[in-house]
């Protein structure tokens, strides 16, 4: 199993190109099921989850071609199977996103519940409740969501803000009979990106980027060409890496307007930030200052950046509080950071961080995707060597992270075994 070996190597300097957003690419790939035409996607990150989605769509009969660099062609005209099996779904929660488009186009769908998916901690109940409101008959049997029925437009008010639920119901509504009003929608940039692609495919959607979207169903959608929005979380991760090591790095193919709160927090921590339409520059010449963090839904501070800022705060001047309001049990990186010498205590959904002068390298285990990133960031500023194990988590969301960081001066290498 691969590991990352990391040692401090001074300030980072240079340029990094940001990949397309995984959290946008996965629903966009699933949108290919809505049409018999060809959906051409550009700026797609070549990640483990993207490859799993490719296998899932191919298993349903879709024709999926890729240049293995950043482009995909998905043709749903050959789909001959409306079942998404456990073998593929178990590794990736986003697989549930085939439910809405498959049901809407074919009138039936069977999708395995994602592995470890408690209808509690990260629920799919809002997806199912919304589809039932649109006329679907749904049963959960033998670990599968089995849905059938012709969808009809209606008013759907989601009980909580859910990105996946919004995306699933939005895709389903494009082919439903009549008008669907989706209320309490997530407004993340990745949701907006999906909606804009659906419009290119012939969907009639108003209210994009707001909490209420109105979808007028059409008989069929057609193919189109679409470029995936840049990954704001990958960009934020690299910015935190520079903030902890010092230096000056320019991010290309970035989308600063999608991550303004993160940029504001970096400025508060002492970084100098410049930005244009598609680039961000960070210049850090001092020890970071501790900054309080409270995760909330977009456009607030993203939960997916909480762990990276925890690493930054661990070596910052002063103390701070980090409050996690989105997901439970999302402080699993704290014990690993403490093994490196951090001074972090937790109480419920709040972490109290007292900055230390320097961390020390250690063997640490990645427990999830963003926790992995926080350990990499910590290792870049730690005394001695840090070894991050179980980096398959990291590969789910970061494309060649060791090569990108290495290109700006980080001492980081991937090793097997």
UniProtKB/Swiss-Prot annotation:
> Which NCBIfam families does this one have?
murA, PRK09369.1
- Entries under InterPro entries matching the protein: Enolpyruvate_Tfrase_dom (IPR001986), Enolpyruvate_Tfrase_sf (IPR036968), MurA_subfamily (IPR050068), RNA3'P_cycl/enolpyr_Trfase_a/b (IPR013792), UDP_GlcNAc_COvinyl_MurA (IPR005750)
What this protein is called in its record is UDP-N-acetylglucosamine 1-carboxyvinyltransferase
Q: Which pathway does UniProt place it in?
A: Cell wall biogenesis; peptidoglycan biosynthesis
Give the positions the UniProt entry annotates as the active site: 117
Question: Which keywords fit this entry according to its UniProt record?
Answer: Cell cycle, Cell division, Cell shape, Cell wall biogenesis/degradation, Cytoplasm, Peptidoglycan synthesis, Pyruvate, Transferase
Q: Where are the transmembrane segments?
A: none
């Amino acid at each position: 199993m691969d590991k990352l070996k990391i040692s401090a190597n001074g300030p980072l300097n240079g340029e990094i190109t940001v990949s397309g957003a995984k959290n946008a690419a996965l629903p966009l790939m699933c949108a290919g099921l809505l049409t018999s035409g060809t959906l051409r996607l550009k700026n797609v990150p070549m990640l483990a989850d993207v490859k799993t989605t490719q296998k899932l769509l191919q298993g349903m009969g879709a024709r999926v071609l890729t240049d293995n660099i950043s482009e995909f062609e998905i043709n749903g005209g050959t789909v001959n199977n409306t079942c998404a099996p456990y073998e593929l779904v178990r590794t990736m929660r986003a697989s549930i996103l085939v439910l809405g488009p498959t049901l809407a186009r074919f009138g039936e769908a069977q999708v395995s519940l994602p592995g470890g998916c408690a209808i509690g901690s990260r629920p799919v109940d809002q997806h199912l409740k919304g589809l039932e409101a649109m006329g679907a008959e749904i049963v959960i049997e033998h670990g599968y969501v089995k849905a059938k029925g012709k969808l009809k437009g209606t008013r759907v008010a989601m009980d909580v803000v859910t990105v996946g639920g919004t995306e699933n119901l939005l895709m389903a509504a494009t082919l439903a009979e009549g008008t669907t009003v989706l209320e309490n929608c997530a407004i993340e940039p990745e949701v907006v990106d999906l909606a804009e692609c659906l419009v290119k495919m012939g969907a009639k959607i108003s209210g994009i980027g707001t909490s209420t979207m109105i979808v007028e169903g059409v008989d069929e959608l057609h193919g189109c060409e679409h470029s995936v929005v840049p990954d704001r979380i990958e960009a934020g991760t690299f910015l935190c890496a520079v903030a902890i090591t010092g230096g000056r790095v320019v991010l290309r193919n970035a989308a600063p307007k999608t991550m303004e709160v993160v940029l504001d927090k970096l400025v508060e921590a002492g970084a100098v930030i410049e930005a244009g339409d598609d680039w961000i520059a960070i210049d850090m010449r001092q020890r970071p200052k501790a900054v309080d963090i409270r995760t909330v839904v977009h456009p607030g501070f993203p939960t997916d950046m909480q762990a990276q800022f925890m690493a930054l705060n661990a070596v910052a001047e002063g103390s701070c509080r980090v409050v996690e309001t989105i997901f439970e049990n999302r402080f699993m990186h704290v014990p690993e950071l403490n093994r490196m010498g951090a001074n972090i205590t937790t109480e419920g959904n709040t972490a109290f961080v007292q900055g230390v002068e320097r961390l020390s390298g250690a063997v640490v285990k990645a427990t999830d995707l963003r926790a992995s990133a926080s350990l990499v960031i910590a290792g870049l500023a730690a005394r001695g060597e840090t070894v991050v194990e179980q980096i398959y988590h990291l590969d789910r969301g970061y494309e060649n992270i060791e090569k990108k960081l290495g290109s700006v001066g980080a001492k980081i290498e991937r090793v097997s075994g």
